[in-house]
Amino acid sequence: MSYLRNILLMGSALSLVACGADDVASPGDGVIVTPTPTPTPTPTPTPTPTPTPTPTDCPTGTTNGGIISGFRNCVLQGRISSNLLLRKIDGLVYSLSGRVDVGTDVGGAGTGGQSAVLTVEPGVTIFGSSGNDFLVVNRGSQLFAEGSATDPIIFTSRSNVEGTATDSSQGLWGGVVLLGRAPISDCNTNTTGGAVDCQNVVEGTTNALYGGATANDNSGTLRYVQIRYSGFAIAPGNELQGLTLGGVGSGTVLDHIQIHNSSDDGIEIFGGRPNLKYLVITGADDDGLDTDLGYKGFIQFVIAVQRDANNGDSMIEADSNGNENATPRQNTRLANFTFIQRSEVQGENTILLRGGTDYTMVNGIVIGTRNCLDIDGQGGSTTQPADPARDEAGPPVFHSIVMSCPTPFRDETDTPAAEIQTIFNSGTNNNANYTPTLTNVFINGANEAAVTAFDASTLGSFFQRTNYIGAVRDANDTWYAGWTCNASYVSFGSSSRNCTAL
């Protein structure tokens, strides 16, 4: 029995020795089964976006102009004699065929003609194909073009719709002309300036009249609007601007407006009483802001940037068409502006004040290529003392203005540089030789932030009080973003589209 037990134990030991370590299962193990790997899921294909269908017809009040670059083209032409609404319809754009009038001129007294209202919804695009295509809103009629911060209204050129416009394109269609019954100084008849029958023909047309005696006249609202690639010369000295305001009254609302690559001025104001706020003027080939014919008003928050050394003239031109003692006298008040002049081919001034104009500038930044400030005037008309009996406010006024140009003040016989310097230095916190520290072309840096601001609200209730100079306080101040368009020479951020695209 002991012998048999020993034999069995020896067999068991030999069996264990014959087994490799890999053949020994852990306690409780059975058959080892290697699981089949989970198959990689087939990715869901990204759906192809459904193209916006092109509308098959056009709204009432327009005619079908066919298809242009995948858009239905709905044409405005002739005279709009009754109220018209241009709706935002996906896949549809509107166009101007020739001069398009809103209403018929009602005259300075508002007793003639026929008024009409053109309303444009946010996101609408309206284009012109040539310099003969432009929009005129006549006295007594109104334009309500109210876009939004994320969906601006765009007035532009056919080439922009077709995708062929570039950052050097300009003068590809006429522009927008807004007329009213507010006072002007220069009449086309032997009439006293500012009278109800004092009227004139606006530049770029032969018979579009403006002027009257209604200071608070209301020509409508332009808000969150772009006007691209406009401007057209009918004849030398007779041009359409990006936006032309003739005799427009203070009841008109004008804010958040960009003028891009106008072949003439960005905005020209012929008399009247309009107030403007939040303006962006990019690439104007003449003056950025031109004011004439007894304009009285307030303008705040302006960014104006020229394209390059070969395009543009002054950032401001203010005068009165040679009639320097005509009344009402121009009295423009400008606050919180940043001007970037780059042109070296036209004019010699960044700011030109002449023709007996009265002008007040506060909280401004001026960067130029030649003379920062030129004040002209026959017989000292632009620098004469205040005289309420003659509607004269006195010499130009400057507070919290900083300038950086090769020459601060232009030296000429009518107003020598020393006299201009005395006027400039009579204000507070001015610096004619400051060093710019702007970022992204127009945003204040350390040197700009160090300047003590002037309380602009003391000049009029339209002005907001700010604690900074310039148009843009810092990188967190983004009033310009989203509703503007970008170019290679200036960017307003990723929320703004490129000007060359819709």
Whereabouts are the PLM-identified features?
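Hydrophobic helical h-region of N-terminal Sec-dependent signal peptides
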Residues: 9-13
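C-terminal motif of bacterial Sec signal peptides marking the signal peptidase cleavage site
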Residues: 15-18
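Glycine-rich loop(s) and the adjacent beta-strand/alpha-helix scaffold that form part
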Residues: 151-152
